[in-house]
């Protein structure tokens, strides 16, 4: 038995111990000055992680230790010199260059002369990959009791006189208090032994422990299965697999394998895997409505059949006959490669198409691959198929997500707190796991070179002085059976179809200004039978718009009007009424309240802290500049990049990711990176925009 396998078996034989850890640092780039560790009953705090390593080692003699940290990438960077030399890179997980699970191995100092292990490996998990968002927001969503929840330092910081506004200027005004700036100032100055700081740190650890243990309990998974799930998506897949085994087996019944046929089929289908639809149709909307679909992806997964089983490949006339058969009888499902003409008269065309390095929805002559259902939608809108090249056809379909979604829909609608949040997480995360890329960049120990060479995996050799030895980054394919791209492609296709029908319906009644995956901003109100605040697949009114300024996809400003909204409250019934009239203890009463109009600002690629500093004036200024640039272009003037660039902020200092610094060979994991953000206003958009006339036209495709 190998030493690695022996150590794994010893670790697995021990009971699991869940711990939570948090660090406080002198700003984004400063050193750690306080570290807290909580095991569910006992809390410890020291000024360095090095001091806590001894405590953790003591735990490992009895337990298989799993330490959860919220935003692991940041904390691991801060303690890299204390922990990286012991890294077990083979069993650590890096996703999109971010460390998600970090495992330490054994080193010589952890072994006695008798070769008895006195310290087992420790696994660090990133809780923010299981439940996204700030710890404060998660505590609110999970209804963590006040004595165990994250505390707000605002009053304390104001009392100390260390509060800052959004521009970093001192302030005593609670209304001008900026949380990010003020907390940054506080952590730069505070004494490590200040009671308020230590209570803040303790409750961060306690709150995270409550959240993690709640997740384990609600998931219903054995703890060892839960700990195999590094992300929300992997957790959702595990819950689906364990609780709905028959549906799961159907979902993975398409065997892509590693044959040439499997590679061809997967590549073919992935070309039909498009994302959500985000488009600006007009840049200004003066009065209108903003609607969102309730749980769009969950809904289409619940009510639509998904292809399963072994697909067949057909070409030419056979492919044409297969599609014709499906079109007549709707039996099975599949993907069609064809040349299709989309009428140039359509203001909002139906089919997604990759052009100009964007996902566009053009008119004209398109060559591509789409689901049968989206081709059917295009034909409804007057499209004409000019030639069919080939298709992948699944004879069988099934409602493989109906029970899964229905179960969590019931929990979401009848629960609150942790259960409701968990239900949302499970429904939203599952489908994307089926579309996961098969090949991923993976960091491995240098001992894996031989395996990579045998299997033909490309790799590069690297070295980091803190790690103390060479390692590699390799492109390793996954054999996971749940990688089923046709499922993800079908789910997104169904979602686009539902959105499109909403767009066309509203276009018949007035202007449509904007859409984003599951939302529409438009001039006219939706029909009553399409609207409901909770029902899956129905449209929920998010707000009545006074004004909308839409610059580009995911970059817009909206001002909502004041509204009078009904709400139900529980009112206690007096004992007299209960006794005399046999009334219940509590009764629901409808009342009305004035909701002041709010503002929504989105800006793609800009961190939330900077978006908070924006205002309507910024979006209006950009729009006016776009009109000016358009007028100049129409006059034939040349416009330089400098003239077309609109700066949002300059000189922001950002941290590099832990994996980036590891691969760069740096011994400084706090290396600063200066970032400037802005928008180049002459970039090609997803439609031909006319900012002056407040309209747009779809691009014209000329593929054939």
Over which residues does each language-model region extend?
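Conserved acidic
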Residues: 4-20, 28-32, 38-704
């Amino acid at each position: 038995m190998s030493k690695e396998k022996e150590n794994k078996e010893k670790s697995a034989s021990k009971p699991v111990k869940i711990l939570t850890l948090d660090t406080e640092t002198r700003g984004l780039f400063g050193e750690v000055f306080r570290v807290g560790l909580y095991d569910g009953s006992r809390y410890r705090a020291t000024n360095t992680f090095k001091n806590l390593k001894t405590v953790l080692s003591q735990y490992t003699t009895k337990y298989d230790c799993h330490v959860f940290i919220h935003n692991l990438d940041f904390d691991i960077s801060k303690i890299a010199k204390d922990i990286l030399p012991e890294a077990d890179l083979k069993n650590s997980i890096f996703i999109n260059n971010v460390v998600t699970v970090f495992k330490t191995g054994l080193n010589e100092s952890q072994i006695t002369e008798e070769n008895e292990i006195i310290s087992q490996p420790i696994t660090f998990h990133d809780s923010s990959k299981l439940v996204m968002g700030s710890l404060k927001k998660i505590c609110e969503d999970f209804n963590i009791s006040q004595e165990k929840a994250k505390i707000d330092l605002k009053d304390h910081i104001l009392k100390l006189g260390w509060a800052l506004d959004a521009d970093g200027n001192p302030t005593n005004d609670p209304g001008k208090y900026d949380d990010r700036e003020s907390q940054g100032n506080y952590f730069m100055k505070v004494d490590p032994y200040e009671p308020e700081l230590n209570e803040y740190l303790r409750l961060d650890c306690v709150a995270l422990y409550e959240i993690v243990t709640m997740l384990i309990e609600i998931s219903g998974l054995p703890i060892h299965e839960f700990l195999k799930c590094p992300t929300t998506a992997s957790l959702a897949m595990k819950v689906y697999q364990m609780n709905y085994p028959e549906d799961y087996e159907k979902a993975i019944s398409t065997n892509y394998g590693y044959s040439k046929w499997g590679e061809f089929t997967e590549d073919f289908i992935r070309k039909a895997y498009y994302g959500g639809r985000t488009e600006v149709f007009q840049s200004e909307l003066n009065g209108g409505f903003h609607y969102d679909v309730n749980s769009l992806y969950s809904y289409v997964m619940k009510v639509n059949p998904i292809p399963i089983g072994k697909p067949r490949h057909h070409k030419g006339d056979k492919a044409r006959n297969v599609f014709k058969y499906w079109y007549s009888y709707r039996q099975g499902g599949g993907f069609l490669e064809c040349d299709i003409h989309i009428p140039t008269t359509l203001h909002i065309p139906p089919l997604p198409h990759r052009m100009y390095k964007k996902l566009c929805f053009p008119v004209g002559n398109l060559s591509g691959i789409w689901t049968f259902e989206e081709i059917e939608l295009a034909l409804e809108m007057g499209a004409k198929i000019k030639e069919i090249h080939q298709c992948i056809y699944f004879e069988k379909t099934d409602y493989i997500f109906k029970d899964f979604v229905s179960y969590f829909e019931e929990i979401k609608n009848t629960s609150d707190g942790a259960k409701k949040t968990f239900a949302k997480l499970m429904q939203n995360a599952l489908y994307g796991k089926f579309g996961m890329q098969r090949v991923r960049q993976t960091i491995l120990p240098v001992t894996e070179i031989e395996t990579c060479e045998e299997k033909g995996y490309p790799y590069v050799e690297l070295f980091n002085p803190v790690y103390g030895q060479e390692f590699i980054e390799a492109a390793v394919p996954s054999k996971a059976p749940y990688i089923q791209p046709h499922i993800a492609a079908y789910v997104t296709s169904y979602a686009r179809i539902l959105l499109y029908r909403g767009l066309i319906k509203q276009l018949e009644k007035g202007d449509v200004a904007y859409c984003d995956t599951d939302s529409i901003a438009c001039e006219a109100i939706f029909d009553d039978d399409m609207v409901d605040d909770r029902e899956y697949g129905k449209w929920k009114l998010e707000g009545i718009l006074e004004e909308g300024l839409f610059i580009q996809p995911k970059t817009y400003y909206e001002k909502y009007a004041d509204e009078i909204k009904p709400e139900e409250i529980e009112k206690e019934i007096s004992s007299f009424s209960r006794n005399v009239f046999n009334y219940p203890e509590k009764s629901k009463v409808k009342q009305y309240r004035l909701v002041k109009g709010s503002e929504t600002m989105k800006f793609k690629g800009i961190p939330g802290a900077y978006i908070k500093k924006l205002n309507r004036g910024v979006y209006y200024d950009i729009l006016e500049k776009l009109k000016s640039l358009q007028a100049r272009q129409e006059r034939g003037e040349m416009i330089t990049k400098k003239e077309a660039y609109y700066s949002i902020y300059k000189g922001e200092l950002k941290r590099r990711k832990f994996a980036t610094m590891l691969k760069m060979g740096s011994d400084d994991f706090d290396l600063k990176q200066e970032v400037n953000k802005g928008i180049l206003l002459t970039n090609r958009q997803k439609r031909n925009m006319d900012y002056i006339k407040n309209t747009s036209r779809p691009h014209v495709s000329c593929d054939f």
